[in-house]
């Protein structure tokens, strides 16, 4: 297949679906983490026939998933070169932007100068200002929030400033405006994301976060593959929280999603809407609903639901289309703690035109995905090593 024939690429990020600790995992406290294999083991095996045919079982041993003799996709693993294990860092590297300096994190709470700035915008000082699980902090502070109207601020070991507010106390629009204000404040502190966390409910027993979550990311500190594709006249559609992660930069149009099912549906719609360009999708439920909440069984069900959808989605592809399935970090629900884990990520690359699968080995950077897409469309490779020659 010649270079000019490639027309559409779909890049799907299974948020949090790592496949084993990186060599430096112990430096992040993540020795022994291996999200996908551990989820499969905890579930007593997974039924992933479509991913199995593509070659998933040849990347790492996964209970219930065979290492087929003749996989239909290129397969391998990618290591993260950037410092960190957060969503923004992982996605930026997938788009060709490697960070030498990690985002700042505040696991012991934010300093007074940041909280003072928040109070100036909100009109009140926040509750919380601690590192906590999103569901647990609602149990702890949700009722006080209802009584006082003070927003809840919390963080984690990742570079996030999260603001939770009940939808009857603060409208989503007001919460988003507050987050936008804090985004401007926090750029100079290198906080990766400000996250709006609206919730509903009447007591600690039934408080529940809604699908109104919004991420306000620090803008990428340089151009990415997305900018290059746009500048070359191609369409870049961001499904799920992709546009938020890139602060809208390089995104032709955003298709927000409420959950994995909606994200998968919109990915299929997006592919039908473009003739030349990229559909970049994030499916967040693996991480948000199951990894952080230590729900391995729910994680496994979500993977099986994705696999069932994927089988039908592949029928939409033309010979000139390419599919890349990967992840941005790990989020192992079987290890202590509720945070992300520093892991390698799976790499599956498929097209109807691909004659047979091959082993891509262990790639040295997530940016190899961006390098390959750039190579397919005859764009400059900013960083990473293209594996386009393996597609010909």
Swiss-Prot record:
Mn(2+) 1 binds at residues 15, 328-329. Mn(2+) 2 binds at residues 287, 292, 340. InterPro entries: Alkaline_phosphatase_core_sf (IPR017850), DeoB (IPR010045), Metalloenzyme (IPR006124), Phosphopentomutase_DeoB_cap_sf (IPR024052). It catalyses: 2-deoxy-alpha-D-ribose 1-phosphate = 2-deoxy-D-ribose 5-phosphate; alpha-D-ribose 1-phosphate = D-ribose 5-phosphate. Pathway: Carbohydrate degradation; 2-deoxy-D-ribose 1-phosphate degradation; D-glyceraldehyde 3-phosphate and acetaldehyde from 2-deoxy-alpha-D-ribose 1-phosphate: step 1/2. Its EC number is 5.4.2.7. It comes from the Bacteria. Keywords: Cytoplasm, Isomerase, Manganese, Metal-binding. It is found in: Cytoplasm. One of its GO terms (biological process) is 2-deoxyribose 1-phosphate catabolic process. CDD domains: PPM. Its cofactor is Mn(2+). GO terms for cellular component: cytosol. GO terms for molecular function: magnesium ion binding; manganese ion binding; phosphopentomutase activity. Binds 2 manganese ions. Isomerase that catalyzes the conversion of deoxy-ribose 1-phosphate (dRib-1-P) and ribose 1-phosphate (Rib-1-P) to deoxy-ribose 5-phosphate (dRib-5-P) and ribose 5-phosphate (Rib-5-P), respectively. Belongs to the phosphopentomutase family. HAMAP family: Phosphopentomut (MF_00740). This is Phosphopentomutase. It comes from Syntrophotalea carbinolica (strain DSM 2380 / NBRC 103641 / GraBd1) (Pelobacter carbinolicus). The gene is deoB.
């Amino acid at each position: 297949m010649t270079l000019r024939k490639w027309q559409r690429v779909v890049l799907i990020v299974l948020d949090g679906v790592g496949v084993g600790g990186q060599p430096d995992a112990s430096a992040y406290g993540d020795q022994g983490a291996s999200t996908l294999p551990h989820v499969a083991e905890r579930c007593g095996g997974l039924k992933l026939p479509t991913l199995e045919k593509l070659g998933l079982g040849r990347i790492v041993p996964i209970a219930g998933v065979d290492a087929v003799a003749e996989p239909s996709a290129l397969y391998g693993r990618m290591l993260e070169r950037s410092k960190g294990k957060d969503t923004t860092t992982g996605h930026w590297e997938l788009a060709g932007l490697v960070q030498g300096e990690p985002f700042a994190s505040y696991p012991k709470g934010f300093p007074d100068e940041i909280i003072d700035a928040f109070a100036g915008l909100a009109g009140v000082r926040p509750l919380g200002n601690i590192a906590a699980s999103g569901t647990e902090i609602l149990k702890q502070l949700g009722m006080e929030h209802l009584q006082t109207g003070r927003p809840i601020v919390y963080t984690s070991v990742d570079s996030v400033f999260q603001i939770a507010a009940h939808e009857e106390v603060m409208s989503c629009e007001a919460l988003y405006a507050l987050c936008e204000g804090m985004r401007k404040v926090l750029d100079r502190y290198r906080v990766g994301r400000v996250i709006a966390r609206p919730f509903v409910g009447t007591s600690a027993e039934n408080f529940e976060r809604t699908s109104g979550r919004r991420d306000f990311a620090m803008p990428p500190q340089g151009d990415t593959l997305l900018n290059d594709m746009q500048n070359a006249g191609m369409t870049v559609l961001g499904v799920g929280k992709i546009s938020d992660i890139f602060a809208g930069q390089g995104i032709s149009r955003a298709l927000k999603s409420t959950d994995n099912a909606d994200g998968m549906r919109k990915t299929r719609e997006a592919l039908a809407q473009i003739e030349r360009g990229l559909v970049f999708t994030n499916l967040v439920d693996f991480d948000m609903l199951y990894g952080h909440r230590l729900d391995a069984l729910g994680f496994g069900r979500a993977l099986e639901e994705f696999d069932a959808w994927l089988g039908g989605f592949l029928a939409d592809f033309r010979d000139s289309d390419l599919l890349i399935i990967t992840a941005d970090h790990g989020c192992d629900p079987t290890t202590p703690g509720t945070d992300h884990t520093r892991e390698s990520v799976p790499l599956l690359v498929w097209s109807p035109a691909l004659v047979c699968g091959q082993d891509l080995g262990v790639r040295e950077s997530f940016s190899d995905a961006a390098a390959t897409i750039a190579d397919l469309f005859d764009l400059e490779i900013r960083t990473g090593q293209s594996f386009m020659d393996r597609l010909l």
